[in-house]
């Protein structure tokens, strides 16, 4: 799958609406983010942040691919492509 550069977005979120889910005995923190793309459209993603790593993976409901985000303290920056 090629990267669609036209869908690149940057997301900044606050973990105030965190929820936890369990997957294979590993706990993840779910953070809701709203992305702002260069096409001025909005993409909502859900990122699952592993407590063992700052690298988080989010799924885009648009179906165009994955979103990878990196957590910095109490905020998250996401790159949607």
Swiss-Prot record:
Domain of life, source organism: Eukaryota
Annotated family: Belongs to the hssA/B family.
Protein name: HssA/B-like protein 5
Source species: Dictyostelium discoideum
């Amino acid at each position: 799958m090629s990267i669609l550069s036209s869908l690149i977005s940057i997301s900044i979120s606050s973990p105030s609406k965190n929820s936890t889910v369990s997957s294979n005995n590993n706990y993840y923190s779910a953070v809701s983010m709203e992305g702002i793309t260069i096409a001025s459209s909005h993409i909502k993603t859900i990122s699952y942040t592993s407590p063992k790593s700052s690298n988080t993976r989010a799924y885009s409901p648009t179906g165009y691919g994955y979103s990878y985000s990196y957590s910095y303290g109490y905020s998250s920056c996401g790159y949607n492509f």
